């Protein structure tokens, strides 16, 4: 009996957050496929071109769009938040591949976490800032 040696699977990990969405991203050497929660990226992002381009944009900036497969576990939020969380996760994973990737990604703004989140509703108001109609008399 011969023992086969397994080739180590090379994973590059990155986590992205946006609004209430969290995306755990794995970059694996491949041919440019995007798999989100077990579905092809085009299906999961409902064939929306802007979401797909947002997910791929860090790879396109570095010219690596056909070199890595993107495998994502995304939870929380909506599709926009998840797509932008995936973009941040991909950019962070690319930084773990090679530190020289950091400068062009930072210049394009892919490594900046968008800290805007929904403001909470306050009591006495209808929404976060909308007050009930004021009647003088």
Curated annotation (Swiss-Prot):
The keyword Ribonucleoprotein applies. InterPro entries: Ribosomal_Su5_D2-typ_SF (IPR020568), Ribosomal_uS9 (IPR000754), Ribosomal_uS9_bac/plastid (IPR023035), Ribosomal_uS9_CS (IPR020574), Ribsml_uS5_D2-typ_fold_subgr (IPR014721). It is found in: Plastid, Chloroplast. Belongs to the universal ribosomal protein uS9 family. Coiled coil: none annotated. GO terms for cellular component: chloroplast; cytosolic small ribosomal subunit. This is Small ribosomal subunit protein uS9c. GO terms for biological process: translation. One of its GO terms (molecular function) is RNA binding. Keywords: Chloroplast, Plastid, Ribonucleoprotein, Ribosomal protein. PANTHER family: RIBOSOMAL PROTEIN S9 (PTHR21569), SMALL RIBOSOMAL SUBUNIT PROTEIN US9M (PTHR21569:SF1). The gene is rps9.
């Amino acid at each position: 009996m011969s023992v086969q040696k397994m080739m180590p699977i090379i994973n590059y990990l990155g986590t992205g957050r946006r609004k209430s969405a969290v995306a755990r991203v794995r970059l694996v050497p491949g041919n440019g496929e995007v798999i989100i929660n077990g579905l092809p990226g085009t299906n999961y992002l409902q064939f929306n071109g802007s979401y797909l381009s947002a997910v791929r944009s860090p790879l396109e900036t570095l010219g690596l769009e056909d070199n890595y497969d993107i495998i994502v576990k995304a939870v929380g939020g909506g599709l926009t938040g998840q797509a932008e969380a995936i973009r941040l996760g991909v950019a962070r994973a690319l930084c773990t591949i090679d530190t020289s990737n950091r400068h062009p990604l930072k210049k394009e703004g892919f490594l900046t976490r968008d800290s805007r989140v929904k403001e909470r509703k306050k009591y006495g108001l209808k929404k976060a800032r909308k007050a009930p109609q004021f009647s003088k008399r």
